[in-house]
């Protein structure tokens, strides 16, 4: 368990030293942490799926829910009725035929 800790510690030190070596000026490394307003807006927009709009749930404009603008493709599909009694009888006949064939050939 200690060896895993030491490996993680060495990895953290090497990662930190390579970051410091990549940015000799301390101000340059901080520039990566700052996001521009354009990228923050773009990130917010990309969270919405295509075909969704925000519907305001309150009159003051605070809060809202996502609502799909597309028509729903979830439709109720009726499954045909299958008569299981007939299928069970056919399965029993098939099992009996297989058992007879195996008995005739001497297989188990």
UniProtKB/Swiss-Prot annotation:
It is found in: Secreted; Host cell. A motif (Calmodulin-binding motif) lies at residues 79-83. Keywords: Secreted, Signal, Virulence. One of its GO terms (cellular component) is extracellular region. Its main location: secreted. Residues 1-22 form the signal peptide. Coiled coil: none annotated. A motif (RxLR-dEER) lies at residues 45-58. Transmembrane segments: none annotated. Belongs to the RxLR effector family. Interacts with the host calmodulin. Secreted effector that associates with calmodulin to interfere with plant defense-associated calcium signaling in hosts. The RxLR-dEER motif acts to carry the protein into the host cell cytoplasm through binding to cell surface phosphatidylinositol-3-phosphate. This is RxLR effector protein PPTG_18954. It comes from Phytophthora nicotianae (strain INRA-310).
